C-alpha cells in the first residue's frame, strides 16, 4: 500500500481498498487545513490574551478608584471627627467658663 500526493493534494492510490482511500483523503483535508487551523488558533489566543488584558486593566482601574474614594472618605471622616472633637472641646470650655462665672 503506497500513497503519494502533489502540492494540489491529488491522490494516487496503489490499492483497491476504498476505506484506505477515504482515510487518506481525510488525512489530506486535515493536513491541508493545518495552516488555516494554526492561524485561527493563533488568532483566538491573541484575542483571548487581549480580552484578558483589558479585563485585568479594568479591574485594576476600578480597584484604584475604590482606593481613591476610600481615602477621600477617610479624609472626610477624619475632618468630621476633628470638627466634632473641636465642637466638644469648645462646649466643654464654654461650660467651664459658665461654671466659673456662676461661682
UniProtKB/Swiss-Prot annotation:
One GO cellular component this record assigns the protein to is: host cell membrane
Q: What is its main location?
A: host cell
**Localization per Swiss-Prot or TrEMBL:** Host membrane
Query: Where does the sequence pass through the membrane?
Result: 35-57
Keywords assigned by UniProt, alphabetized: Host membrane, Membrane, Transmembrane, Transmembrane helix
Q: How does it sit in the membrane?
A: Single-pass membrane protein
Q: What is this protein called?
A: Uncharacterized protein ORF103
Amino acid at each position: 500500500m503506497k500513497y503519494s500526493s502533489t502540492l494540489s493534494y491529488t491522490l494516487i492510490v496503489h490499492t483497491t481498498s476504498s476505506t484506505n482511500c477515504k482515510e487518506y483523503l481525510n488525512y489530506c483535508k486535515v493536513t491541508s487545513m493545518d495552516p488555516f487551523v494554526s492561524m485561527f488558533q493563533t488568532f483566538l489566543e491573541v484575542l483571548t490574551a487581549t480580552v484578558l488584558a483589558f479585563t485585568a486593566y479594568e479591574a485594576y482601574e476600578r480597584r484604584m478608584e475604590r482606593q481613591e474614594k476610600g481615602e477621600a472618605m477617610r479624609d472626610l471622616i477624619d475632618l468630621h471627627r476633628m470638627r466634632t472633637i473641636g465642637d466638644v472641646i469648645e462646649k466643654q470650655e464654654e461650660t467651664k467658663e459658665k461654671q466659673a462665672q456662676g461661682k
